[in-house]
Amino acid sequence: TTLILDILKGYAPVVVTQNYFPEYIQLSALLAFLGHIFPFWLKFKGGKGVATYLGILLALSYSLGFLFMFTWVVVSLIFRYSSLSSMFSSLTVLVITFFRENAVKAINPDFIFAADIKLILFIFFILIIFTHRKNISNLKNRTEQKIKL
């Protein structure tokens, strides 16, 4: 249930914003993401943001959301590290969005906010790397827990 609720934390505000205030989609996505990672009621110590990011992606573009999930599953099956899968999936979405105009058009057919969307996805990627800094250290030291399949 935590996974579903965290996905909804990203999905719901972006969908509402798309329908009522489309010019604020990027701001809505950013605030939902930051609110998950840095909640003030938990002294700014929240989650890693991956599920919320997935919810945001699904709200912006199902194709990018499914790309993220597909990449996560493939990397998880190969390496069995959730953290590595999350970071690599985020990088994959970022790279596809930067180099494939069709990916940006899937988010916004009018192509009005293309640069903003790319910037927001870049910020999300940086923040996901930031929230995984302990995991990165564990991966380097070979102490990261593997996913049990």
Model-derived segments and spans:
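Anionic-ligand binding patches
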Residues: 11-12, 22-45, 50-59, 68, ...
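Hydrophobic alpha-helical transmembrane segments
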Residues: 25-30, 54, 66-70, 87-91, ...
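Interfacial segments of multi-pass membrane proteins
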Residues: 17-21, 50-79, 91-101
